[in-house]
Amino acid sequence: MNNLPRYQFQNRAAGGNCIGMLLTGGKSKRFGSDKLVHTIEGQTVAELSAHALSLACDTCFEVGLGLTGLPVIHDSSGQGPLAAIAQSVMYLRDQKILEFGQCALVLAGDVPLITASTLRIVANWPGRSSLVPVVNGREQYLAARWSPESLDRSIFLTKNGLMKVSKALDVSGTQRLSMDAWESQDNQEFLDIDTPDELRKLVNAELICIPDRRSQS
C-alpha cells in the first residue's frame, strides 16, 4: 500500500459531475435491528450519511427505504448493494439523469462520521476512473467514486448472478487512494456501524460533531 497516491485534505467545491448514491437497503443482521434509523444527537445514522453526501454532490439519490429525505430509488431486488447500484444506474440512465459517461459517488448509509470535504476529494479526484479510498489497508468500495465502466460492470455482473461489489471495480484504470490522515486511531471517519456496541462506543467517544458538518455547506 505504500505506493498508493496520497492527498492533502482540504475543503473543495461540490463534487464535480458525480451523481451521489446513498445505499440504505441493508438488512442489519449483525446489529439486530435497523441500524440506519438509530439516532445520534437527533439525527439518524442514515441522515448523517445523507447530509455529507448531499453537500458533496449536487444531485443525490437514496437507494433503498426512503429514510433520509433524498429522492428515493426503491431497491426492489433485495440482493445486496451491487444489485441496488445496478438497478439505480439503469433507472437513472433511463430517466436521462445519469449520462452514460458520468461517474457516481457511492456511499453506504451506515458511515455517520464521513464528512463532505472527504467525499468531495474522492468525487473531484482528477480523471473519470473509479477511485477507491484505502483506510488502514481496507478498500472502501462503498465510499468510492465509480467510473462509467464500473457502473456498466455492476449491471453485467448482477445479470449474471455475481454480487461481489469489488468485482465491479476490477476494471482498467481503477485507482486506490491512501487516506493517510486516517492512520491515527482517533480518526475513524470511514467507520461503518455493524453492532450496537460499535454505535455506543462511537457516541460515548463523541466522535460525531454535527455542527462541523453543517459548517461545510
Residues covered by each model-derived region:
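Nucleotide and nucleotide-moiety/phosphate-recognizing core
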Residues: 3-165, 170-188, 197-210
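Dinucleotide-binding Rossmann-like beta1-alpha1 core, especially the glycine-rich loop
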Residues: 191
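Long, low-complexity, intrinsically disordered segments
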Residues: 210-217
